[in-house]
Amino acid sequence: MKKILILLMILWAFALVACGGGAEIEIRNYDIIDIINQQPVDEEVFYHNIPVDTNIDEPPHIPDPYIDLVEYEPIFTMQPLPDHIIRLIDGSSFHAEVPFGFDFLTYLTISHRDFEGNLQQGHMIVAEEIGKEVLEIFEEIFHANFPIERMRLIDFYNALDYYSMADNNSVAFNFRTIAGTNILSRHAFGMAIDINPIQNPYIRGDIIWPADGIEYIDRENIRPGMITPGCPVYTAFISRGWIWGGNWTSPRDYHHFERR
């Protein structure tokens, strides 16, 4: 059998020479024989017998982004509206009818926990005169581990309150009127804040905003993210003189707090 294999290899080599236009190939029969005679290797024994240098230090730990989640420090800061934010809101939530300048407002960076307990970084625009107080409120809410789904400027929703609510977004400044009236909302002056609209819907008769809030009209069935009398959100705002829309008779605006 070995002789047949050797003969086949030699014939194969000559065929390569013929196809290659006369190129010379050295045939080393002993190499072919050695390959044929080679015994299969027991890989377990082979690798087990490799000498190991025990003086090599352990490699440094490289964080796995899918396993080693980084927990950042919470942030609660205020600053004048940055240029890129002015460009974002100009002509959107802040338009020609606004009776004050950009310096009337302040830009907040606020850390909060989402419904999975993850640390998130949100942003709000409020009146500059209450900026520090709002930061204190949300820092208190943060340390109480009250979940807030998201916190984005209304301009990411084309300044349309309904779409922001449908996305369960918590928001403050938006120069607009009170729904169904010509009266300016406290949101128009950066003096009102809405939190978790789905868990805390606006209810007026048969009207429920946002629509998904229908699951939370039973205020006795308390679930995460709901604002109720005595909860951390309620206490943080009410203790500082804010008014809660959930205490109104009609409408009941459970997600709404305002400063007067």
What role is predicted for each listed range?
Residues M1-I4:
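Positively charged n-region of N-terminal signal peptides that target proteins for export
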Residues E149, F156-I183, A236-I243:
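Conserved short secondary-structure elements within globular domains
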Residues V17-A18:
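C-terminal motif of bacterial Sec signal peptides marking the signal peptidase cleavage site
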Residues N29-I36, D42-D53, I178-L184, F189-R260:
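Catalytic cores and adjacent binding grooves of peptidoglycan-active enzymes
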Residues A96, L119-E128, T181, D218-G225:
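Second-shell loop/turn segments in exported
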Residues F100-M165:
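Active-site acidic/histidine clusters and adjacent loop/turn architecture
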Residues I25-N118:
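N-terminal module-boundary/linker segments of secreted carbohydrate-active enzymes
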Residues I6-F14:
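Hydrophobic helical h-region of N-terminal Sec-dependent signal peptides
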